[in-house]
Amino acid sequence: MITTVKFAKTKPNAIIPTKRLEDAGYDVYPCFDEDYMIIKPHTTVIIPTGIASACDTDYCFVLHERSSTGTKGMAQRCGIIDSGYRGEWGVPITNTNDVPIVICKKESITDFNDFASILLFPYGEANYILYPYEKAICQALVLPVPEVEIEKYTYEELKAILSERGTDRLGSSGK
């Protein structure tokens, strides 16, 4: 059975997420009115996408970093889009670099470069990372959400359930 995923534009210039047959996730694109958006070093900004969605209640969307954003120091933060959420998707991106990241529209790059050194003066002349507005900023996986029953146990009862790891913590597997 094929599940239908529904997307809608919340802004006219938004791009509906795209996916090739062999890709796991849908590419999600930025959508903002300004010519560019700056993400200062070591800060997180929610990037608007101009899209909303709906899907069956037994699915959700999970946002993940793309390799093209990760190599630029753009870390995609948490991102679960529940089946019942109908608002615009916002993608939290953290700049892990010591210089600003500028998501810039193609037609604005020439103008942007003219005043970039003034705008970004504290970080040094023309010392920034340019990310094209036309590229996807994350990918969205459609994952099943199983319906489960919860059973309550005392902590002692829970620890008594067989487990290879038990209560051992980080690094305990030796892998």
Task: Please report, for each region that a protein language model flagged, where it lies by residue.
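DUTPase catalytic domain/fold
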Residues: 1-175
